[in-house]
A protein has these predicted regions:
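Nucleotide-activated sugar donor-binding and catalytic core shared by glycosyltransferases
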Residues: 1-66, 74-184
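Conserved C-terminal portion of the radical SAM core fold
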Residues: 71
Length: 184
């Protein structure tokens, strides 16, 4: 293991990412506590599976703003199924800097993205993975990630447990220091 090249990119842009955080929240009118949610895997984009995920998210939409940069198939589901709430924000995809700026100061990230599991771990942001497994196990063993699946009751339980806990402060992962390319 020589490191993680994706973390090199994050480290190289970290100052811009952190600076972007307040700017992007202001631009998007995010004023309180919020979750960032990304769903893009075909297995999660069926109407049945999205219904389970959104039922879990809606339980928290009165207390938290829920920000979703949306995949086109996800937008279609949202439009077809009237998934509207004043605290659910459906966005067009954001730039890398703005997206990670938003992630860096979020209360929680829910995702099915492997890369985002790594980025949240490095940014020390709590992450719940909407899958039954991960190809990034280090994000669970040493990071801030927990794999929870997509069953509504499990999503509700894990969000409650995670936001109420002090948990999720990951450890510094060896070689995730922005110097992977030098070691290669």
């Amino acid at each position: 293991n020589v490191g993680n090249i994706m973390i090199d990119t994050l480290e190289k842009n970290l100052e811009k990412i952190l600076k972007s955080s307040d700017q992007i929240k202001e631009k998007l009118n995010i004023t309180g506590k919020y979750f960032v949610v990304t769903i893009h895997r075909p297995s999660n984009l069926s109407d049945e599976n999205l219904a389970k995920i959104f039922a879990g998210l809606k339980e928290f939409s009165n207390e938290y703003q829920i920000v979703l940069p949306a995949h086109p198939r996800l937008k279609k589901y949202i439009n077809d199924n009237d998934v509207e709430h004043e605290n659910i924000f459906i966005l067009n995809p954001l730039s890398y800097i703005d997206f990670l700026g938003l992630v860096s100061s979020s209360d929680l990230v829910l995702t099915d993205s492997g890369g985002l599991q790594e980025e949240t771990t490095h940014l020390n942001v709590k992450c719940l993975t909407l899958r039954n497994e991960t190809e990034r196990p280090i994000t669970v063993s040493e990071g801030t990630n927990k794999v929870i699946g997509i069953e509504t009751e499990k999503i509700i339980y894990e969000i409650n447990t995670t936001i109420q806990s002090k948990l999720s402060k990951g450890t510094e992962i060896k070689f995730w220091d922005g110097k992977t390319s030098e070691r290669i």
